[in-house]
Amino acid sequence: PRLETAGAAIATVTAQFLVFAVLVFRIFTSGLETNVLRELHLFSRFPRKFYKNIFRIGFPTAIQSMLYCMISMVLTRMVSAFGAAAIAVQRVGGQIESVSWNTADGFASALNAFTAQNFGAKKYDRIRQGYRISFGILTIWGLIITAAFVLLPRPISGLFFHDPESLGISVNYLIIIGFCEAFMAIELMTIGALSGLGMTKLCSIISIILTGARIPLAMLLTHAGMGLNGIWWA
């Protein structure tokens, strides 16, 4: 039977559960020496002295992620006032833009681990070198994405939209968000590096303030006559 939207939801949950099951299975069955998690007791009590550091590092990031979702919902509500085509462009546009932020997120995760490892070993020169190399790579990648979005918005949009209204909105979206791709990539990478140093509180404060500023800025630009494009610029 056709499950439509419910089918997509079921498929997503099923896939996530299977990935989780495979990972847990491999953790407890892999005999590799590097598998330090094999003897892990997930439900055993651990020393109280670890609570403070776990809370100090993890809580700011958790709050940041939660507030980011809430802010995104508010912005989506604002976009919905401009019709179904605007919502579709926001959704698909975010997926198109993922070629930039997903890459940056991968570098951030790698740099997080690299920075933490070398910070613990007091190899500060390696931290600076790793950041410098990552900065160069992501700057080039971000500029390539910027050029593609700004110079080729219509061909890219045409891969996903065919009706004139959605196509026009998508072209504007790609041009506007295209200008920030390099900056966004470097931002995500830097957050990864600082988090590796244990500075998650600083990252979260900056991110929450600036991300939260999107809402009043979007309202201001929208009512200033920019319409939907005001939300994209925000």
Q: Language-model segments: which ranges?
A:
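Helix-terminus/linker motif at the lipid-water interface of multi-pass membrane proteins
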Residues: 1-3, 66-95, 99, 117, ...
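Short alpha-helical transmembrane segments in multi-pass integral membrane proteins
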Residues: 2-59, 115-180, 221-234
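Transmembrane alpha-helix boundary and packing residues in multipass membrane permease domains
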Residues: 12, 25, 61, 65, ...
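Membrane-embedded alpha-helical transmembrane segments of multi-pass integral membrane proteins
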Residues: 19-22, 71, 184-187, 213, ...
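Hydrophobic faces of transmembrane alpha-helices in multi-pass small-molecule transporters and flippases
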Residues: 22-25, 43-74, 99, 103, ...
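Small-residue-rich hydrophobic transmembrane alpha-helices
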Residues: 76, 89-147, 151, 184-198, ...
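Membrane-helix interface segments
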Residues: 85-86, 200-202, 227-228
